Amino acid sequence: MSNRIDLSNESLIDTKATSSKGNQLKWLVGGKWYKADHMGYEGLCEVVISRLLEKSNVKDFVRYHPVMIAFDSKEYAGCYSDNFRAKNESIVTLEHLSKQWLANSFAKELLQYEEPKDKIRHTVEFIEKVTKLKNVGAYLTAMLELDAFFLNEDRHTNNTAFVLNDDTGEYRYCPYFDFGLSLLADTAEDYPLGEDVYQLIGKIHAKPFDRDFDTQLDAAEELFGSQVRLSFTRADIDTALNDVAAYYPADIIERVRDILYAQRKKYQYLFMK
């Protein structure tokens, strides 16, 4: 039995800047964020990935839950999560920080550097300078490891962010979140259902330091070491997919299962021995 909520009388939140693939329907209601699927099965990705991260050394991440959303006489599969931002806090993206401090887009800033390692080093130094946060290299490396494993194609400079305390001016890290465009979720445009999964994986372009996931991942790990340790099994993958089986067709469930099994085999070094 699926969970359902009617948001027809609620106001939409503008999300144009936070995704490279259009404006996803999004609401903030009663201290919870609701997101409707826009390109394919984003909600499934958020839920399943957060379930799997429970079996890892990653402690600070957003936990998502599946939901059917009624809005404007239509029904959407999607997900919801608790709002991790307090009333006196704002989300500040890397792109916003760059425009504020450098008067330039950070995506353009990165064009000054050819090697991914130099791009990552520059990014870490800039973030630490303006936010005063420590261990930014470890934080970004873990993000790149998770993005590579889960094939997240949407980690651009408007989708890397920090939490600002509006009263004190102090920053803290965002929990790891926003994995919606992972696991070939975009079935509407780039990764149609019915096509060979492994050929589609080869088409994915990573962000923001290189188009290849492993190239930017290797560069970050050379600088800051490997950060993420996973411990979920194939049975844990099956359990996570069972949690969303009432919301998505069987062919989507099986496609994601195949992808996760393959990624688990490829990135064995990330798993706890």
Predicted regions and their residues:
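Conserved ATP-binding subdomain of kinase catalytic cores across diverse folds
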Residues: 1-106
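Short hydrophobic/aromatic-rich motifs at helix boundaries and adjacent loops
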Residues: 21-25, 116-119, 131-132, 209-212
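Generic structural hydrophobic/aromatic packing signal, biased to beta-strands
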Residues: 29, 34, 64, 81, ...
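C-terminal catalytic region of ATP-dependent kinase domains
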Residues: 37-38, 54-56, 166-273
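Active-site-proximal structural scaffolding
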Residues: 42, 46, 139, 153-156, ...
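Short alpha-helical "patches" and their helix-cap loops
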Residues: 63-72, 156-166, 273
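ATP-dependent phospho-/nucleotidyl transfer catalytic cores
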Residues: 84-144, 247, 251, 266-268
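Conserved kinase catalytic-core segment
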Residues: 118-185
